[in-house]
Design a protein with these regions (language model features):
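Nuclease catalytic cores that cleave nucleic-acid phosphodiester bonds
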Residues: 54, 73-83, 165-172
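Short amphipathic alpha-helix used as the core "switch/output" element in two-component signaling
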Residues: 15, 22, 39-64
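CheY-like receiver
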Residues: 98-101, 105-138
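A short, hydrophobic beta-strand element within the central beta-sheet of small alpha/beta folds
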Residues: 33-36, 53-75, 88
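Output/docking surface of receiver
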Residues: 9-16, 44-47, 68-113
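Acidic, metal-coordinating helix/loop segments flanking the phosphotransfer/catalytic sites
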Residues: 2-33, 43
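Conserved aromatic
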Residues: 14-15, 126, 160
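Amphipathic alpha-helical packing elements
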Residues: 143-174
C-alpha cells in the first residue's frame, strides 16, 4: 500500500515564476506535465508573460512534456501554440471539462492510443497493462517508434507507477 501511495502522481503548486522553476528543476525527471496560468509574479512583480516564459523554458529543456496554458485572455492562445502547449480558456463555461480531458489524454491517465504517425489515425487502444501486453506485437513498427521516441509510452507507464520500464523507454529517442 505504501509503495502504491508513493507511486501516485503528485500535484505541486507554485505561486511565482521562481517557485515554478525551482519545482521544475527539482522534479524535471518525473514531471508528467505542466499546467500554468499566464499572469503571476516574476521577479517580485506581476508579469503578464510569466506563464509564457515558463512554457518557453520548460519546452527548451524537454521537447515532449505536455504543457497547458490556462488564461482568461484568449490572445494567449498564440503563445500556447508557439510552445506546443494546449490552451484552456478560463472564461469557458466548460473549462473544468476541457482541462480534465487534456490532462487525461496528454498526461497519460487515459487509454493509450497508438496512432499512425503520418495520418494520426488510431491503430490500437489499450486501457491497461494487460491489454498492452496482448497487442504490443500487432502494433505497426512506425507507430511504436513514434510513441516511444516522444516519451508517450514512458509517460503512460509513469502514470501507472511502472517506473523501471518507463525509465528505460524514456531514454530511447529516435529521430
Amino acid at each position: 500500500r505504501t509503495l502504491r501511495m508513493r507511486g501516485r502522481p503528485k500535484i505541486v503548486l507554485a505561486r511565482t515564476y521562481e517557485e515554478a522553476m525551482d519545482l521544475y528543476n527539482k522534479y524535471q525527471n518525473n514531471v508528467l506535465g505542466v499546467i500554468t496560468d499566464a499572469r503571476y509574479p516574476r521577479g517580485g512583480v506581476v508579469d503578464p508573460m510569466a506563464g509564457i516564459k515558463l512554457l518557453a523554458e520548460v519546452r527548451s529543456r524537454d521537447p515532449f512534456v505536455p504543457l497547458i496554458l490556462q488564461s482568461a485572455e484568449v490572445d494567449n492562445k498564440v503563445y500556447a501554440s508557439r510552445y506546443g502547449a494546449s490552451f484552456v480558456d478560463k472564461n469557458s463555461k466548460k473549462m473544468n471539462i476541457d482541462l480534465r480531458e487534456i490532462v487525461s489524454d496528454d498526461f497519460g491517465f487515459g487509454d493509450f492510443i497508438f496512432r499512425n504517425p503520418d495520418t494520426l489515425e488510431e491503430v490500437a487502444r489499450v486501457h491497461n497493462l494487460k491489454e498492452l501486453q496482448n497487442v504490443i506485437f500487432a502494433i505497426p513498427k512506425e507507430s511504436l517508434l513514434y510513441h516511444i521516441s516522444r516519451n508517450h509510452v514512458s509517460r503512460w507507464l509513469y502514470s501507472r507507477a511502472m517506473f523501471p520500464p518507463a525509465e528505460f523507454l524514456k531514454q530511447i529517442t529516435w529521430e
